[in-house]
């Protein structure tokens, strides 16, 4: 795969237009194609620009395009070889081609990577549901909610701004976030993981010592209010098996609208 930063501007424009046909939350792919973050893009050689694979630095990836079905074997070979893969990859498929035998081919014997099979849930935000439950979401006693700043970029954790943005300046420019804190601890952070047009996908991270207090809910609710005031639509996606994230999304006014194939692929050996 080649770095998105090496692509010609017109190539990125073509890919961005092609992504508009994908009926799924693909902000991570847009972030790479639009040049907001680094990343990798591969195009099937035998079908020109009609079948693509994009990988975000966080590890999320997408196969999409009008010609995926015509070059399915070439795509499978590319994914199974995995020469580009240096960390665990979380692969999503353009819903138009979800019925192709991805699981059968990716998990076939002889591959260089371990493959796990999951489902990813895309949610849709309902402002009426959010407002109906907003009064029940309060900042816990002893905590305060404040806007994120540059120091939050380097926050430790697995779902944190440094995994989604190249630097603190870009993180704050494209959405920033809100954090819950007390005198001793930064308890939770709700932040912009992907920003595209007038939509923003949320990321959430809670400090291990602060879990179970409702901090993530309160931080996310403040961020959603801020987004709505700016005319920005909140977006939420997660693995179906992440029950805490599914429950949090529901509490914040999101409801599931589609469930898609989702594959974990380890680096090749």
Identify the residue ranges that each predicted region occupies.
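Acyl-donor-binding surface of acyltransferase catalytic domains
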Residues: 27, 38-154
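Conserved active-site alpha-helix within GNAT-family acetyltransferase domains
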Residues: 98-112, 217, 240-258
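Glycine-rich acetyl-CoA-binding "A-motif" of GNAT/NAT acetyltransferases
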Residues: 48-50, 185-188, 244
């Amino acid at each position: 795969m080649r770095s998105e930063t090496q692509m010609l501007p017109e190539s990125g424009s073509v890919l961005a237009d092609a992504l508009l046909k994908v009926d799924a939350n693909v902000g991570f792919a847009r972030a790479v194609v639009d040049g907001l973050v680094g990343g990798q893009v591969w195009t099937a050689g035998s079908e020109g620009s009609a079948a693509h694979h994009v990988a975000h630095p966080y590890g999320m990836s997408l196969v999409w395009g009008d010609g995926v079905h015509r070059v399915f074997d070439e795509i499978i070979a590319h994914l199974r070889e995995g020469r580009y893969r240096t960390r665990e990859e979380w692969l999503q498929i353009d819903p138009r081609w979800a019925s192709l035998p991805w699981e059968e081919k990716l998990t076939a014997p002889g591959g260089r990577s371990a493959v796990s099979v999951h489902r990813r849930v895309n949610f849709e935000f309902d402002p009426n549901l959010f407002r109906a439950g907003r009064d029940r979401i309060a900042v816990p006693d002893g905590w305060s909610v404040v806007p994120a700043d540059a120091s939050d970029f380097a926050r430790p954790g697995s779902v944190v701004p440094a995994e989604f943005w190249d630097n603190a300046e870009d993180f704050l420019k494209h959405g920033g976030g809100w954090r819950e804190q007390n005198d001793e601890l930064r308890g939770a952070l709700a932040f912009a993981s992907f920003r595209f047009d007038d939509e923003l996908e949320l990321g959430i991270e809670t400090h291990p010592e602060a879990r179970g207090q409702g901090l993530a809910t309160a931080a996310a609710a403040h961020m959603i209010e801020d987004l709505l005031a700016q005319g920005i639509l909140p977006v939420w996606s997660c693995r179906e098996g992440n029950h805490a994230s599914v429950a949090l999304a529901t509490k914040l006014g999101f409801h599931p609208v589609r469930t898609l194939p989702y594959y974990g692929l380890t680096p090749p050996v």
